[in-house]
Amino acid sequence: MIPYCYHTHTYRCGHAEGEDEEYVLEAIAAGVRKLGFSDHIMLPNFSQPNVRGDYKELEGYLSSINFLKEKYKEKIKIYLGFEAEYDETFESYYRSLLEQHKIEYLLLGQHFSFANGRIIDYFGHVHEKEQLIKYKNLVVKAMSTGLFSVLVHPDLYMSAYDKFDATAKMVAHEICKASLKYNVPLEINLGGIRRGIVKVGEEKRYLYPYKPFWKIVAKYGCRVVIGVDAHSPKNFTTNEYSIALSWIRELGLKHDQDIIINENRTKIDEKL
């Protein structure tokens, strides 16, 4: 049984399937008590087909999830949010969504960075130390803003980097320090487990989660959550959750099953 899921996508991103209500019904059937929708954020004046929905789809997304929140309030607690990459260009937009209570939370998923009109992809394309450092700098800066409730798949940078060298370890340590300093939990992502064991360099492993990274997390005692990263209603009834739980037990990770997903939004409200 999966008690909570705050990492759920919709068909609008172009690479997920199923209607919004199907996710709710399957989550209820799987025993989920708290469900957060967090589709890839729609950005104004920015198009990224098959990665995120166009900005014109924003209101439809908000309306649909708010409708389902009310319809199923006796059966499941539904939260409304987005998964977003950090970039200073979009910080005021993210803040306005939270301040205006259009959404309840943001997940930090640093799949990309944006520079001089170029998109730098961190999923499966990080091979140089400079890219690791850029990734680390972005996620640490993002956590410092107070906008994000969880850093999802924090070990994404290891999806193609084929050695856990001094630079990769330094990135892990700095992410953990920031997680503690800014009170941002780290997510063990089931999406990487669903992809199965693959060969990266000389290792056969998941692209993520990457166990050596999580051994460092355990030493720091950072709060940890599990993210289904649902891209299909069927993802709630597969066995990846039990694998993540076994890692938590094996490594002695601090599993926060009672996370208040929108606690950072409350902090933002208090500053107004």
Predicted segments, located by residue:
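Divalent metal-binding pocket/active-site signature
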Residues: E17, L43-P44, L107-R195, L207
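Short, well-ordered coil/turn segments that N-cap beta-strands
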Residues: M1-I2, G31-K34, E74-L80, H101-E104, ...
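Short beta-strand and adjacent tight-turn residues that come in two discontinuous sequence segments
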Residues: F37, L108, G227
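Short, contiguous clusters of charged residues that form electrostatic/catalytic patches at enzyme active sites
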Residues: G60-S63, I133, N137, P212
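An N-terminally biased module of ancient metal coordination in phosphate/nucleic-acid-related enzymes
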Residues: M1-E88, S92-Y93, L98-Q100, D162-M170, ...
